From Swiss-Prot:
Family designation: Belongs to the cation diffusion facilitator (CDF) transporter (TC 2.A.4) family. SLC30A subfamily.
Residues of the signal peptide: none
Positions on the Extracellular side per record topology: 55-64, 120-134, 222-228
Protein known as: Zinc transporter 6
Compartments reported by the entry: Golgi apparatus, trans-Golgi network membrane
Cited InterPro entries: Cation_efflux, Cation_efflux_TMD_sf, CDF_SLC30A
GO BP annotation list: regulation of zinc ion transport; zinc ion import into Golgi lumen; zinc ion transport
Transmembrane helix found in the keyword field: yes
Annotated gene: SLC30A6
Length: 460
């Protein structure tokens, strides 16, 4: 039978959780303005959809989708306020900033799907063009234009403002920029208005309204109904071209990639860290975008054995914190004691052992209290370190040196040749470990698995 919980906390449903989070956001006065714009947006969308049905205009429908996108942007702004008031939890230790990235990505992808739907409907209308009624066409155009511009310019939407600046320019922005340069070449006084990078949302709102005005005039003058379908295709293409760079940028953030524009700055900071006093090596560095304008990273630093860990950690954090706001640094001390010798089979290509000298390791003091990987005192209950830098481990085969090599002194070496029989009978090893065949040779293969010694026993 399972455990009986007398005072078990009741689990909230999904609707209850959403209601609780919505109340948390609504408690902030700054969100009241967004909620008001959202209510007006829903009313405006309802009227526009009715006018789209009465006019039978697919171009007005495509333009209405931009108003629906404004509703998504307002929801994204609410999520941004929710992220500000929420604190990191054990499940989301980095905070909830990725939720607003996900909201931007979802909004732009939905806008592109709406543009694809308009393209599909327009292709069907080219085969059989219906009659377009212009009664509410111009009214719907100006209502949608006014509300879109009023929403974009009145509400400070931090996520979309950042994405529109950081993402690559759309083809519509590039063409408008070329046209602006030509106009400013004739009238230099307009350079302060046209030359800066235009807001892509304002640009597509104005371009879509201009296309609908041209549609209205051509239908009123010549009853040319096909221009409505052409305008719908143009608005859909502009929508897709405007949203695509933003979805790509937010998608890269979700994939935890490093922004290309910070490569040079990160490389410079890592070079400065590698020159700090006590630092021997910087490796396993990984940096990624946690949210819009927030960079996170982790780095492993190998230091000298006599270096102060806290001092090095403070210097490394101080250097990288100027660019990386969320940083994890792991400090490892240098490992200079080699692991214990282990028995290995004699290679077939070693014909005469008398031509070699076997180096025996000096006696290890307090071998039981040393970690064989990092050679630092470790408690019996402490787990092995996660990483080691350029450390072969316990399973590295011994090395046999030739007679022609220089013999080091003061290490307890046996000078002179060792008979073949004594090598096989006596064996070499660490005191207290038993007599084993402990030759250091570079001819046998080094086991590729870390954590298992050559005796077939797994390391704890």
């Amino acid at each position: 039978m399972g455990t009986i919980h007398l005072f078990r906390k009741s689990q909230r449903s999904l609707v209850g959780k959403l209601t609780h989070e919505f109340r948390l956001v609504a408690a902030d006065r700054r969100s009241w303005k967004i909620l008001l714009f959202g209510a007006i947006n829903l009313i405006c969308i309802g009227f526009l959809l009715m006018w789209c049905s009465s006019t039978n205009s697919i171009a007005l429908t495509a333009y209405t989708y931009l108003t629906i996108f404004d509703l998504f942007s307002l929801i994204t702004c609410l999520i941004s306020y929710w992220v500000m008031v929420k604190k990191p939890s054990p499940v989301y230790s980095f905070g909830f900033e990725r939720f607003e990235v996900l909201a931007v990505f979802a909004s732009t992808v939905l806008a592109q799907l709406g543009a694809l739907f308009i393209l599909k409907e327009s292709a069907e209308r080219f085969l059989e063009q219906p009659e377009i009624h212009t009664g509410r066409l111009l009214v719907g155009t100006f209502v949608a234009l006014f509300f879109n511009l009023f929403t974009m310019l009145s509400v400070r939407n931090k996520p979309f403002a950042y994405v529109s600046e950081a993402a690559s320019t759309s083809w519509l922005q590039e063409h408008v920029a070329d046209l602006s340069r030509s106009i400013c070449g004739i009238i230099p006084g307009l350079s302060s208005i046209f030359l800066p990078r235009m807001n892509p949302f304002v640009l597509i709102d104005i371009a879509g309204a201009l296309a609908l005005c041209i549609t209205y005039m051509l239908i009123e003058i010549n009853n040319y109904y096909a221009v409505d379908t052409a305008s719908a295709i143009a608005i859909a293409l502009m929508t897709f071209g405007t949203m695509y760079p933003m979805s790509v940028y937010s998608g890269k953030v979700l994939l935890q990639t490093t922004p290309p524009h910070v490569f040079g700055q990160l490389d410079k900071l890592l070079r400065e860290v590698s020159t700090l006093d006590g630092v021997l090596e910087v490796r396993n560095e990984h940096f990624w975008t946690l949210g819009f304008g927030t960079l996170a990273g982790s780095v492993h630093v190998r230091i000298r054995r006599d270096a102060n860990e806290q001092m090095v950690l403070a210097h490394v954090t101080n250097r990288l914190y100027t660019l990386v706001s969320t940083l994890t640094v792991q400090i490892f001390k240098d490992d200079w004691i080699r692991p214990t010798l282990s028995s290995v089979p004699i290679a077939n290509n070693m014909l005469n052992l008398s031509d070699h000298h076997v180096i025996t390791m000096p006696s290890l003091k307090a071998a039981d209290n040393l970690n064989p990987v990092t050679s630092t005192p470790a408690k019996p209950s402490s787990p092995p370190p996660e990483f080691s830098f350029n450390t072969p481990g316990k399973n590295v085969n011994p090395v046999i040196l030739l007679n022609t090599q220089t013999r080091p002194y003061g290490l307890g070496l046996n000078h002179g040749s060792t008979p073949y029989s004594s090598v096989l009978n006596q064996g070499f090893g660490i005191p207290g470990m038993g007599a084993t065949q402990g030759f250091r040779t570079g001819f046998t293969n080094v086991p590729s698995r870390y954590g298992t010694n050559t005796r077939g026993q797994s390391r704890p």
